[in-house]
Amino acid sequence: MMYALFLLSVGLVMGFVGFSSKPSPIYGGLVLIVSGVVGCVIILNFGGGYMGLMVFLIYLGGMMVVFGYTTAMAIEEYPEAWGSGVEVLVSVLVGLAMEVGLVLWVKEYDGVVVVVNFNSVGSWMIYEGEGSGLIREDPIGAGALYDYGRWLVVVTGWTLFVGVYIVIEIARGN
């Protein structure tokens, strides 16, 4: 299971390398969608069925609409792929070489260390009350996001709206 998670993580980073090498918008959108699916599978691997499904439906659904619209507005007759130009190919190869170097370094030094500790999340923890029952952590986490992070949700929604508006204005040419 650890190797599957490791391969999924490598696939996620390689997807980001493929996107950051600035291919045509069609290929960039495809790579982001595939990376999003891999990220959702990683969440499912950690036992977050509810959160993985929500991320898949909301994030990927919105992304497919936005990228479908922008690629329709900015369609190219000959789209630039990763092997089309020397610059794009070199950037992909450098990114993949850095990922292979990181994988070998982690393998050599026997893992990674924990950098972030979550010490002050006591109010988000689930405590068992009287009686017996099954409580899943995923919906409780979504409830905590909307309860404690309500302003973060508002700012995120506004940012997504402004981002879509900017992309539409740029694609339209005004």
Swiss-Prot record:
Pfam name, any one: Oxidored_q3
Q: Which GO terms describe its biological process?
A: aerobic respiration; mitochondrial electron transport, NADH to ubiquinone; mitochondrial respiratory chain complex I assembly; proton motive force-driven mitochondrial ATP synthesis
Q: Name one GO cellular component term.
A: mitochondrial inner membrane
UniProt entry tagged with the keyword Electron transport = yes
Task: State where it is primarily located.
Answer: mitochondrion
For this chain, one GO molecular function annotation is:
NADH dehydrogenase (ubiquinone) activity
The record lists the membrane-crossing segments as 1-21, 26-46, 47-67, 86-106, 111-131, 151-171
Where in or outside the cell is it found? Mitochondrion inner membrane
Query: EC number(s) on record?
Result: 7.1.1.2
Q: Does the keyword Ligase apply?
A: no
How does the annotation summarize its subunit structure? Core subunit of respiratory chain NADH dehydrogenase (Complex I) which is composed of 45 different subunits.
State the family named in the UniProt similarity comment for this chain: Belongs to the complex I subunit 6 family.
Per the entry, what this protein does is:
Core subunit of the mitochondrial membrane respiratory chain NADH dehydrogenase (Complex I) which catalyzes electron transfer from NADH through the respiratory chain, using ubiquinone as an electron acceptor. Essential for the catalytic activity and assembly of complex I.
Q: Which disease is it linked to?
A: Leber hereditary optic neuropathy: A maternally inherited form of Leber hereditary optic neuropathy, a mitochondrial disease resulting in bilateral painless loss of central vision due to selective degeneration of the retinal ganglion cells and their axons. The disorder shows incomplete penetrance and male predominance. Cardiac conduction defects and neurological defects have also been described in some LHON patients. LHON results from primary mitochondrial DNA mutations affecting the respiratory chain complexes. Leber hereditary optic neuropathy with dystonia: A form of Leber hereditary optic neuropathy, a mitochondrial disease resulting in bilateral painless loss of central vision due to selective degeneration of the retinal ganglion cells and their axons. The disorder shows incomplete penetrance and male predominance. LDYT is characterized by the association of optic atrophy and central vision loss with dystonia.
What is the name listed in the Swiss-Prot or TrEMBL entry for this protein? NADH-ubiquinone oxidoreductase chain 6
Lineage of producing organism: Eukaryota, Metazoa, Chordata, Craniata, Vertebrata
| Gene name of the encoded protein | MT-ND6
